A protein has these predicted regions:
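TRNA-binding/sensing appendages of the translation machinery
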Residues: 1-91, 95, 103, 151, ...
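Charged, compositionally biased N-terminal leader segments and the immediate start
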Residues: 1-4, 183, 188, 195
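Acidic, His- and aromatic-enriched active-site or binding-groove loops in soluble protein domains
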Residues: 58-74, 187-211
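Positively charged, Gly/Ser-enriched RNA/tRNA-binding surfaces
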Residues: 19-36, 45-46, 81-84, 92-106, ...
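Glycine-rich, mobile lid/loop segments that gate access to catalytic sites or pores
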Residues: 170-181
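Short glycine/threonine-rich loop-to-helix capping motif typified by GTGT followed
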Residues: 54, 180-190, 283-290, 337
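Short, structured secondary-structure boundary patches
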Residues: 51-66, 190-194, 292-295, 396-402
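Short Asp/Glu-rich motifs
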Residues: 50-51, 180, 202, 387
């Protein structure tokens, strides 16, 4: 039997789990204080829903579940790989939320302000900050089409990060509609814009030449590709310059409002920036998109945007929706690398007792010590020195004994 967790998935030791519990608790506390309510959805979703979710490259990373019994046999006989699976693990929390809202909308307030903190799964190539099983902390607003929804999500998400001591970050904001308008004016066909946007989103990773090469590989019009390359080469891409190529000035006005308002809310505690190349990889985004970046990590530590068409796939009528997700694993990893300590956390000690001790008295003494410490009750080992060394290595700061009033504090403390 293999003892190691599967590649891209992790076992968590008690010290890390304790820290994660605290961080998640502070995030939830911030979300709830702002009027958001938590829900849960199943980890498995219907493959038809997953396939039609416009999830971009994530659709290639779905963990699929094979059909069972006679259904699997029948599927194998078709020779069609797509017939083999009828369900899969969710790759994010947006599709499940959209299905949930469509099924329960008559029982929910409008606008619906919702929290989801849960595990998602992607068949990634594991690397630092990129796992196959990971936690997302999402907040979404469904039923509000105004840019105030974006402003509120940015405000609540940044306050959650600040409340856990995560600082020095930048909120990057863009609007897909402005970018799409500019690209269409350059000669890209409307039905290719999603593909062009996804390539343009890689600007920071592959550079202008890489973007040009990838668009050329997609056999898009040379004149349009060159127009985009010339625009990038011209220097700083300002919002006004991009907006001038967009047919609807109201879209640019909304983006300017969100940028200005978010910057005012930041009050110097973090940065807010217009990022013209920001697209987000998921195809379901329809308007504004945002990401949070920081110097300690090469990718985004949080991201989201508006997805006004997703719920409509289930209902047949459009429901405005926008969400923001904190990449919990990445944020926790950065904080742990910085030596993060839980503020005001009680230190933990052990109360050791011998086999002839009165156990109710042991529990009573442990209770009397818990005003000052977190106390674990353990039987005393035959080799006390070795036992104390193991306890110290496990993070205990000291040991108490039934026959002594004082607490033995370990040397490193």
């Amino acid at each position: 039997m293999k003892t190691q967790a599967l590649k891209g998935m992790r076992d968590l030791l008690p010290a890390e789990q304790t820290l994660r519990d605290y961080i998640q608790g502070k995030i939830l506390e911030t979300y709830r204080a702002s009027g958001f309510e938590r829900i849960s959805t199943p980890m498995l979703e219907d493959m038809e829903n997953l396939d039609k979710s416009d999830g971009g490259d994530n659709l290639n990373l779905i963990f699929k579940v094979l059909k069972r019994g006679d259904k699997l046999t029948a599927a194998l006989n078709t020779g069609d790989p797509k017939q083999l699976s009828d369900m899969g693990l969710r790759y994010d929390l947006t599709l499940p939320l959209s299905r949930y809202y469509a099924a329960n909308k008559d029982k929910l307030p409008s606008p619906f302000k919702v929290i989801q903190t849960d595990r998602v799964f992607r068949a990634e190539r594991p690397q630092k900050g990129r796992l196959r099983e990971f936690v997302q902390c999402d907040i979404d607003i469904l039923g509000d089409s105004s840019p105030n929804a974006e402003v509120e999500l940015i405000d609540v998400t940044t306050r959650a990060l600040l409340n856990i001591g995560f600082t020095g970050f930048t909120v990057n904001i863009n609007d897909r509609r402005i970018l799409r308008g500019m690209l269409e004016s350059m000669g890209f066909a409307a039905d290719t814009l999603d593909s062009v946007c996804i390539t343009f989103d890689k600007m920071d990773k592959i550079g202008a030449e890489g973007v040009k090469a990838e668009l050329t590989e997609k056999q898009l019009p040379e004149a349009a590709i060159q127009a985009l390359a010339d625009f990038i080469a011209a220097g700083e891409v300002t919002l006004d310059a991009v907006a001038a190529r967009c047919a609807d000035p109201a879209i640019a006005d909304d983006l300017k409002y969100v940028l200005a308002t978010a910057n005012a809310m930041a009050a110097g505690r973090y940065q807010v920036a217009y990022c013209p190349s920001l697209v987000r990889g998921q195809g379901y985004y329809t308007g504004m998109v945002f990401e949070i970046t920081c110097p300690q990590f090469s990718g985004a530590v949080a991201g989201g945007g508006r997805y006004d068409n997703m719920v409509g796939k289930f209902l047949g009528t459009q429901v405005p929706a926008v969400g923001f997700s904190i990449g919990f694993e990445r944020v926790c990893g950065i904080l742990m690398e910085q030596g993060y300590q839980i503020p005001g956390a009680k230190q933990k000690i052990v109360l050791l007792y011998t086999k002839d001790a009165d156990f109710p008295a042991v529990l009573a003494k442990a209770a009397s010590l818990r005003d000052s410490y977190n106390v674990t009750v353990l039987p005393q080992g035959k080799k006390l020195g070795k036992q104390l060394g193991q306890l110290e290595a496990a993070g205990f700061v000291g040991a108490a004994f039934m026959d002594k009033d004082e607490i033995k504090i370990f040397a490193q403390q």
